[in-house]
Amino acid sequence: MPEAAPPVADARGSSPTATTGPGADATLSAVEPFLAHLQIERQVSAHTLDAYRRDLAALIGWASAQGSEDVAQLDSAQLRKFVTAEHRRGLSPKSLQRRLSACRSYYAWLLKHGRIATSPAAALRAPKAPRKLPQVLDADEAVRLVEVPTDAPLGLRDRALLELFYSSGLRLSELCALRWRDLDLDSGLVTVLGKGGKQRLVPVGSHAVAALRAWQRDSGGSAQTHVFPGRAGGAISQRAVQIRIKQLAVRQGMFKHVHPHMLRHSFASHILESSGDLRGVQELLGHSDIATTQIYTHLDFQHLAKVYDAAHPRAKRKKATE
């Protein structure tokens, strides 16, 4: 048996099913050693720890209501019933996935410490959460955003930043980290260090090249300096870019919430719409898995569906007659 855990903040009251059943409060202590492991050894955040506690409290409450006082002894069939009950209670697929993930981690920990012979949660799968389609700017909106006046304070920087964002589809972190040495403006290329330390070469469009040249002349940037420096002299912060893009969108008369990743989404969507080359878009974005890139095919289909609805004679809806 694991040693008793140090006290962990109580979150039992935060789940509707956490205290279901007569023995829920008594058996909640069974997961305290696991929570202590998360807190001390894995050093998870307080937010994550609270989520684990709520999810496991829900399992304990459900098991207690079924007459099972020891959750360590539940089998896969019982866990499947728990997932079904939570789904019927109205829990979203995303929340179910998180709840089942907490159960898997708990049973894996029990297995590692010899409390159980096999994990009843290993093979269980929650319903898939529908992927939310990314919001994008259409081509006209993108042009309106990037063509900010260059005679305003920091106008040259803002123009270069927006042009590069939309031209090359960089992640926010990648753009903030760029130094002038990473740019080959003569060849129209930028070398990007992406997730996992993976390097990729991305084209830079002619409008972005012109804007970057103007900004470099104005700022006196050298090879070692950041393309977009912050006030303290290092790289500009991601938060500063988020705030600035939001401000610029408002100034350009745009009424939707514009954020940095929207420019990356727009880049990917517009390239895919024009080329149809999903693999090429994957490489440009630096996605390790093409499944991540495939979300943009749904956006392209949405566009095609609108074109179809507007143009096809058999798709046009008849106006209701009185």
Swiss-Prot record:
Residues 1-25 are annotated as: Disordered. This is Tyrosine recombinase XerC. Keywords: Cell cycle, Cell division, Chromosome partition, Cytoplasm, DNA integration, DNA recombination, DNA-binding. Coiled coil: none annotated. It holds the Pfam family Phage_int_SAM_1. NCBIfam families: PRK00283.1, recomb_XerC. Residues 16-25 have a biased composition (Low complexity). The active site is at residues 171, 195, 261, 264, 287, 296. Belongs to the 'phage' integrase family. XerC subfamily.
